[in-house]
Amino acid sequence: SLLWVVALSSLMAVLLQSLCCRLGIATGLDLAQACRRLLPRGWVIPLWLLAEVAIVACDLAELVGTALALQLLFGLPLPVGVLLTAFDTLVLLGLQRFGIRRLEALVISLVALVGACFAVEMLLLRPDVASVLGGLVPRMDSLRNSSQLYLAAGILGATVMPHNLYLHSSLVQTRRWSTGPEMRQRALRFANLDTVIALSLAFLVNASILVLAAG
């Protein structure tokens, strides 16, 4: 019943991240630099603090989630799982020195593996297609339950992540392009296509999580 929240959140994320791409390509500034340069100091500091809180909240959920997954799969104690997760995060950061493109390729491979696992599970579950499609129809009554409302808020926050907007506006500048208007337009089209593909795959994974949980 909350698949429509996943779809709506994905559309919002596509819109906001496309705007961040446009900012980065058109001005050469990422979102943080643009805020620092164009906004009063009284606005900049709260925005910075909110971004830090969002990063900590997201990382905490991912850290604990990975530790729980390691416990379920291999029986590892939670503290050991947390340490292993923190270590592999540092390893990924260290891989940046080999170039951002290689790091992107590694992340894409991992995401593809996760997507393949969910695809296999969906084939094994064989959910009712009509029920799944019906979940894409917005229903406000599904949010009257407090637990459903909290879940919907979590889905929205996990899809439209504030710190991702800062990150994406910076990452689009790692690609080299000429300074002419035509090349910038081409870079913008490529960045928008990249955003749509990435968030469409994220939508499929998030939708699969809900369907599998319901099954």
Where do the protein language model's features map onto the residues?
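Selective recognition of specific alpha-helical transmembrane segments in multi-pass small-molecule
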Residues: L3, A7-M12, L16, V160, ...
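Juxtamembrane transmembrane-helix boundary signature
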Residues: V5-R37, L49-V53, A57
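Hydrophobic, small-residue-rich membrane helices and short re-entrant helix-turn-helix hairpins
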Residues: S1, D141, Y166-L201
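Select transmembrane alpha-helical segments in multipass membrane proteins
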Residues: W4-V5, P40-V53, R144-L156, L204-V211
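Hydrophobic alpha-helical segments and their helix-loop junctions in multi-pass secondary transporters
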Residues: T89, V111-L143, L149-S170
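Transmembrane alpha-helical segments of multi-pass small-molecule transport proteins
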Residues: W48-E52, L73-L95, L113, C117
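Membrane-interface loop-to-helix entry segments
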Residues: L84-T85, L95-L125
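Inter-helical loop and helix-membrane interface segments of multi-pass membrane transporters/permeases
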Residues: G65-G81, M122-Y150, T174-R184
